Amino acid sequence: LTAASCTLLWSCAAGNAPLSDALSALTAQVFASGDASVQSARLDSNYRYLRVDVDGHPSALLVLGYVDPHPQGDIEVWYSGTGEVIRIQNGRIVATSGLSLDWRAVRFPSTPPAWTAVPPQGVFYQRSRDEMPEHRYAITDSVLTTPAPLGPTFSTAGTLALAQSPTVRWFRDDILNSSAAPLPPAWFAWDTYRGQPTVVYSRQCLSATFCLQLLRWPLQEGAL
């Protein structure tokens, strides 16, 4: 993290307690401990949490540090207790830091369509991204967003629970053309969380073999 980011990490708060306290508590309970610890972690209702699952790694919880206003949609900045940062805009990853493979920046020449405005036949958008540690810049993707009648065929704790909800709407992003190696489809579940319509779950791949599953946590709103 940069010095400025570290300053934000230790000073930002969603409630009365500093964010560093929430992160320290999560680090002690969860990180490198796996799914069972995530399930039993004691969460602070002053904060918002994001569960992150990566194949071959223990589950982790991230804390929402702050929301950065942006003309194309607010950017949520999520922190782990061990230094990773994920930035999310309208459900899509727009930057990461501290991962084994990072998308340092994602740019949209024009704003991707709102989820509720995606037509049945789908809609295209363009994306440019920078990738580290390979030092690859301005990778361009042409992406097709379509509604999906069902969720993904793979099963996780998050997708199984969401599959039973009659209110969830599924979408997928397919890269039809790219200046880099193709990526697997990205999946998004749209629903209401804490009274606000939002992406509650997604599976997004930063490479063909490095995929992140992001789930707002706890999934059951009354659990916190």
Short names for language-model regions:
Residues L8-S11:
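C-terminal motif of bacterial Sec signal peptides marking the signal peptidase cleavage site
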